[in-house]
Amino acid sequence: MEASGKLRAYLELVRAHNLLGTVLGVIAGAALLGEVNVAAAIASASAAAVAAGGYAINDYFDVEIDKVNKPERPIPSGRVGAEEARKLALALLALGPLLGLAVGPLTGAYAALNAVLMYYYSKSLKKTGLPGNLAVSFSTASTLLYGSLATAEWAGEVARVLRTIPIILMVFLMTLAREVVKGVEDYVGDKEGGVKTLAVVKGPDFALRAALALACASLALAYLAAPLLSLGYAFLAFVTLGGLLSLASVAACLRSEDPVRCAAKPRRAMKVAMFLGLIGILVDRLVQPVFYPHVLHAGGEEG
């Protein structure tokens, strides 16, 4: 294989396009505390390394299922060897915590926790269904916590991290909804592989209804959390757009004659919703001083 083709295969293996969301999550977490600095940059690189390693080790352990669900993936298609993927994954999972230590011991330990979680999710938790969904949801939502933790630890004010918990829960719920929908999308291969997703255990329709409820709860929590973190109209506009897009997409899939085939649409819609939520945090922090300066930053002091 040509060098360029090999590079593309590696980038596909680590889901390079998804790493943008990881970096945005860390930066948004820092922005929640009102400051994006060098700690956020280091934490972004650390989180991206852990996420990339998690994606790679997932493909390594998931190769038999991917032969059914996604035969075009790098390992089942033969573009990346299984042992290559394993070594790359372990290197990235080790690199993340080492980078985190450059910020501080808590940030390094938190990166290590996520690295271990991603490894064992791929190795065994994934087949447990809901526990695996919860692990992925925690890992995704933790990017915001990672950003706020790194910023707070760098400033020597770790307790400030508690202010970000409501928004982290919002992301957690939307990610959990997406994972439930992903179980519907992968229903055929998961059933053959013995993966106990909600869709396999309770049926695709039940899983979609559960995802709809989780997405509703996530949107409601955004409205409750916004005033607690001094997030204003820009944030709410982005979150509302993403939330309504997700709800409409899941509802349309429920009305479909074949929910398994259409499940990719709400799964993508929820990914867009989470991206819009992160962008909403950043945009809100940028426009706040101009359009509604009376609203205090969550990490600032009253003046």
Swiss-Prot record:
Q: List the CDD domains.
A: PT_UbiA_DGGGPS
Which catalysed reactions does the entry list for this protein?
A: sn-3-O-(geranylgeranyl)glycerol 1-phosphate + (2E,6E,10E)-geranylgeranyl diphosphate = 2,3-bis-O-(geranylgeranyl)-sn-glycerol 1-phosphate + diphosphate
* EC number(s) reported in the record: 2.5.1.42
Which cofactors go with this protein?
Mg(2+)
What's a GO biological-process term for it? Answer: glycerophospholipid biosynthetic process
Report if keyword Lyase is assigned: no
Q: Which residues cross the membrane?
A: 23-43, 88-108, 130-150, 164-184, 206-228, 232-254, 272-292
What keywords does the record list, in alphabetical order?
Answer: Cell membrane, Lipid biosynthesis, Lipid metabolism, Magnesium, Membrane, Phospholipid biosynthesis, Phospholipid metabolism, Transferase, Transmembrane, Transmembrane helix
Q: Which GO terms describe its molecular function?
A: geranylgeranylglycerol-phosphate geranylgeranyltransferase activity; magnesium ion binding
Q: Where is the signal peptide?
A: none
User: Would the keyword tRNA-binding be found if you checked this record's keyword annotation?
Assistant: no
Q: In which pathway does it act?
A: Membrane lipid metabolism; glycerophospholipid metabolism
This protein's membrane topology, according to the annotation, is: Multi-pass membrane protein
Highest rank taxon of the organism: Archaea
Q: Where in the cell is it found?
A: Cell membrane
Q: What GO CC annotations are associated with the protein?
A: plasma membrane
Q: What does this protein do?
A: Prenyltransferase that catalyzes the transfer of the geranylgeranyl moiety of geranylgeranyl diphosphate (GGPP) to the C2 hydroxyl of (S)-3-O-geranylgeranylglyceryl phosphate (GGGP). This reaction is the second ether-bond-formation step in the biosynthesis of archaeal membrane lipids.
Family assignment from sequence similarity: Belongs to the UbiA prenyltransferase family. DGGGP synthase subfamily.
- Protein name from the UniProt record: Digeranylgeranylglyceryl phosphate synthase
